[in-house]
Amino acid sequence: MTSSEHGLKALQERGAEGVVVDVFDAGAVEAAIRRVRPDAVIDELTSLPRDYTPEAMRAAAERDRKVRIEGGQNVHRAARKAGAKRYVVQSSGFFYGPGAGLASETDSLAVNASPGVSGSVRTYLEIEKRVLGSRDLEGVALRYGFFYGPGTYHDPETGSITRQVRERKYPVIGSGAGVYSFIHVEDAAAATVAALESDPGIYNVVDDDPLEMRVWLPAFANFVGAPPPPHISEQQAQELGPDALYYATRLRGASNDLAKRKLGFSQRRLEWLSKATMESGAGPALAG
């Protein structure tokens, strides 16, 4: 299912059958799912901006939450009525709360973070509670890392973050100690397919290279042929908003140990990690 003709065309170009449905129309959602009577449903509902900026993310937040919560509830209810046995849903692997080392699935999410982050965390927790608490539908929540690769914000050719890095508009902020967990979109897709037959539960779908912003961002700039990123103070970053500051200085990396064991999950190294970067001792980061 997709919400637009553009999305439908993209599905068809990839050899998939699709249907345009308003996810807020419970009857239409139920009819579409009942028609195919699926054994499993994968819920990747989002309403994120095409181009990333802190301002665009703030503007999109309320609709994104509505799509995930209200739209997701319609999809989940329809899946149950259609007799599906499993429901796989998107969650977040980069919003863990403070702590030592990499976060596991049993660690708490950052409910007391900056406003946008804590709002997103509440959304993810509500989704996970619904999906994992269903008695008649096995639930799997995949806590993905930051996507990179074709069609993402970090696409090395067309990504909006890539463009900002090339224009030196994406700075390292303050200590740059926030630890980012990434995942290539193709590896995320493979893990999602594996989740159709895994044990129910929560899995961090991230790669082996959680890195501090001060490490990954200069390496990424070099990878895409951009000049080194600027470095600004926390005070200078105030105009970007508290969420940008939280990302840059307080994000905690996630461990993929459980996903490797239970999903048979394997993933590539970060494309922009050069041998020199790793030999410098700069990564991967083991603490947030």
Where are the regions a protein language model picked out?
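NAD(P)H-binding glycine-rich loop region in Rossmannoid oxidoreductase-like domains
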Residues: S3-Q12, A16-E70
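Conserved Rossmann-fold NAD(P)-dependent oxidoreductase catalytic core, especially the SDR/UDP-sugar
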Residues: Y52-V117
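Glycine/proline-rich active-site loop of Rossmann-fold NAD(P)-dependent oxidoreductases
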Residues: A100, L137, Y148-S160, E186, ...
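Conserved beta-loop-beta element that borders a ligand/cofactor-binding pocket
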Residues: R86, S91-S92, E126-G151
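Mid/C-terminal beta-alpha module of Rossmann-like enzyme folds, strongest
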Residues: A189-A244, P284-G288
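Amphipathic terminal alpha-helices
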Residues: E239, R269-G288
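Alpha-helical substrate-binding/gating segment
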Residues: T162-P171, S175-P210
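Conserved C-terminal active-site "lid" loop/helix of NAD(P)H-dependent oxidoreductases
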Residues: V185, R214-P218, Q238-S266
